[in-house]
Amino acid sequence: MEYEHITHSFEPVYDENSRILILGTLPSVKSRENNFYYGHKQNRFWKLLAYLLDESVPETIDEKKYMLFKNHIAIWDVIQSCDIKGSSDSSIKNVEPTDIRKILETADIKQVYANGNKAGALYKKYQLPLTGMEAVTLPSTSPANAAWSFERLCEAWTRILANL
């Protein structure tokens, strides 16, 4: 598989009431095809959030945004553009980071969370020097992280509830 230069095509989802910010790396091939975050049907992000928040699993983009806004959750990614093979985070190179300061200036974000180790490492390298706000790295909800069962993910991700 060849490297492809990808530029992030989604706006961040947040408003002035957002209390936590969850950052991924970059939308996957499937997410870009579906025009929204965590669009791969095997990605457990939406199912996990719905479970933790005692909500129905959202199906449409509007339902997903509604659940985020209702629960004061902002989402975006750490990468504005990069070179990547398919959806493989391990292949990411030539990163141009997003500027999350616009979210932090608008919303009273209590905690930043990284969805997976790669997002956490990139946040630490690029955004932490700009924000001074440490991120908590959580296990990835990606289907590539099959070693983590849904139950284990739920246990690890319950910590987001403390800041909501």
Mark where each language-model region is:
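C-terminal capping/extension of enzyme domains
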Residues: 1-19, 41, 88-97, 101, ...
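Short, hydrophobic/glycine-enriched beta-strand segments
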Residues: 19-25
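Short loop/turn segments at strand-loop or loop-helix junctions that form parts
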Residues: 25, 78-80, 140
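Short catalytic/ligand-binding loop motif for oxyanion handling, primarily in non-cytosolic enzymes
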Residues: 29-32, 83-86, 120-123, 143-147
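Short, surface-exposed acidic-centric catalytic microdomains
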Residues: 30-91
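Short alpha-helical
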Residues: 44, 118-121
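Internal catalytic-core helix/loop-beta-alpha segment
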Residues: 70-118
